Structures are given as C-alpha cells and as structure tokens.
Amino acid sequence: MYDVIIIGAGPSGVMTAYELIQKNKDKKILLIEQGHSIKKRFCPREKSGKCINCKPVCNITAGFSGAGAFSDGKLNSYHLSNTGTPGEIYLGGNDGGYYRKYYDENTIKDVISYTDQIYLDFGAEPHLEGLEYENEIRALQSKAHESGLNLVTFPIRHIGTEKTHELFTKIENYLLQYIDIKFDTKVSDLIITDGLCKGVEVVSTYDEAKKEIISAKHIVLAVGREGANWLFKKCTEHNIVSNPGAIDIGIRYELPDDVMKDVNKYLYEAKFIARVAPFKDKVRTFCQNPSGFVSTEVYDNAIVLANGHSYKNKKSNNTNLAILVSHNFRTPFDKPIEYGRNVAFNLNQLGNGKLVVQRFGDLLNGKRTWDYELENNSVEPTLKDAVAGDISFALGYRTLTDIINTIKAIDKVVPGFANHDNLMYGPEIKFYSNVVEINQDFETNIKNLYCIGDGGGLTTGLIMASASGVQMARILSNK
C-alpha cells in the first residue's frame, strides 16, 4: 500500500511529489500520469508542420509537466503583482478563491515565493520581466483606466517552451530517485467505500482491458484542465460535491510585434481585465507571447483548441494572446464544461477538425475570411494549417460582442490593437469550470480524497497550480 497516490503529473501533482520528498523521504508515493515521460514528449508538428492528432493522448496537453508547463513556461510572480489597489495582489483568472478563503496575504506570498525558488533551483530563468519600467507601466495603467480597463501587472519569469522541457526533465529525474511513477496509465475509477477513498483502478492507455487496483492512505486529484471532464464525471458517479464555476471561452489573437512593442518591452505580458457593455461579463487577456507562435492542442482526443508558444531562441514577427470571456451558468443549465465542449465541437466542424482563423475586419464587416485574403494579409499567420473561415458561426453573439468591444477598448491604450488585418483563431477554451468543494486541507467530502490545481477549479495557471501542490504536500506530511 502507498502512503500517497497522486493522479496527474502536471505542475500541481509534480510539486506535491517534490515537496513530500522534502518533508519525508520515507513516504511511499505513486505518481500516475496518462501521458508520456517528458523524455518522450515531442509534438510532431515541429517537424511535419501540422497536427497529426496524436493517440492515445495529445503530447501537448498530457504527459509529465502537464499542459501549461509544456506549452510556454511563464511563471507569473503574483506575489509581486500590482492591481492598482494598494495592498492587494492578483492571483490569476479565478482570483485565488481557495487561497483568499483560507490564508492571509503574507502566507500566500510566502508559498508562491517558495514555489518560484523551486523552479529557480532546477534552472528557471533568473531574470524577471516587468520590473524595469515603473513609470511607463503606470502610464499604461492610467490609459487603461481611462478606457474602462484594469491593467494588472506582475513580474514574469519566462522560461520558454524549449527550456521548459529541459527544466522538467531535471525534475522528473529527481523524482524518480524517490518515488514510483506510472506513465501511459489512466485512472479508470476511484475506489470509494462508505465515504472513504481507499485507492484507484488503473488501466494502460494502450490496453484498457488490463485493470489493476492500487491502494493508498491518501489520494490526490491533480488532473489539470486535460482531466477536468474526467473529474466532473467522477464527481457525478461518486457524489463528490462540486459546483459549476465559470468557463472561459474565446479566441487566440495575433497581431504584429510592432503594435505591441511598448507593452512587450515594459511588461512582456499585459493582463487587461474588462467588463464592457452591454453584458458586463469579465473579459481578460491571457498568455501573451511576444514574437511567438499560435499552436493547437487536442483535449480528450476529441476537440482542437488554440494556444500560444514563445521560445527563447526561435522568433516570429507577431505577438499572440488569448482573449477569454468568463461565462457562468446556473438554473436550469449548470454544465459549463459541456457547453464549452459543444462550442469547440461546432467550430471544429467548421474547420474540418482544425482551428478556424478570421481577420478581425472581416468579422466586423460580417464576412468570412478566404485563403487568398490571408495570403495578401499584412499579418502573416504563424499557424499554417488553420482554416480560413467565420468564427461567428459557433462562438455566439454574447461571447463575440464581449471580445469585439474589449479589442476596441484596448485599442485606445495600444493603438493598432483593433487593426482589421489582425487575426482571430478559434476556439480557445479553458476547462476548469467544475469547482470541487474542499476544506482547508484540500479534502473533499470523501475522506482521504483531495483535490488541487486547475482541474478541480481551484487555480488557473502554472505558478498557482504549483503552489497548491506545495501546500498539499505540507498538509499530507503531517498525516
């Protein structure tokens, strides 16, 4: 029997394992991951130039280090953030609900700082972007405020996609000295009896007929966004208490570096938050990649979504970023993950299984984009196999209205942001909308079953997911 089983080798699961080792090397720990070892994680697009829909899982979204860590590698120093409100720090897309509920700000800062140092110890970039231009940043924040936007700033430690691979290879090698790791292994079920979780049922991702029961004293759900839909199903099957949270639906936006040069120089990533008329939904920019590349990722072997990469050595002439709208559903419909999957499925149909790309001006003028128009467009697409089309067929009036009005508002701060040749790729959706109810120890209503990271709706992003893993380990080390 294991002391701890961790389901998922993304940032939260990896950091749980790492910190448990620091606290007690004698604990018997098993880390289960449906994807590959990081040594086998390579996207074929790098050589072929197109997505081949890897089976049994996508190499971008699954495998050691998870989806967010493998795609770009930005560590947001939220403990040093500036929201414009004295004494308040920003804690990501869901504003750190768990942390704000249970911990004071100094404790939050300490755990983020500690987590950041772990990454530094394994070779993360020591330089922090966004610390050198205080006056210029304040001027941008002032312009944003005049346009009805909030510009949140925080230093960023940019590792880069290729360097992230090297860093997590070191972490994987370290963990293998002390714990067991099962790669290419799915957790098909949780073993729960009389309100107590006693273990897991696992199968090979290549042969689901071979089942194995593994017992443990404590089971940690660290399934990430890739596992959010799986976790929602398990919550339903086993009466694990959870509630629908917000789902973020939007697009990946691509525009020239020249337009973003000041923002890229001063901040590296600008986090604009808007509540534009008429709906006043929360809209935010996310995951900005200067001189980056638009990319695809496949979730649940079923839906193709947009993302973005930025490398330390390989550069384009474009900046890309996500523009995401937070939607909440209650009565009578309360299945945000299902809604998001349907949006993605419909847009994927329009793109024949690929992302759809449309010029911003064409969307405003009520027309689709054609291939020949992209060939002569001033903004050259960095994602070559996206299909020219019309995203308005699938994204929905409310979502598109929020996105369009946010782009126009940002254009007042960053002239050229609403240029008609800028490109919109769809869909980009973040699946962390099933919020699992937990206590301060991350424990669910099922005894000895814990939930951390993005998959359970607790966090959004690499650093906060990692910090939840550190905190989880500290709690378990005393049990």
Placement of each model-derived feature along the sequence:
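Residues forming the flavin
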Residues: 1-88, 133-479
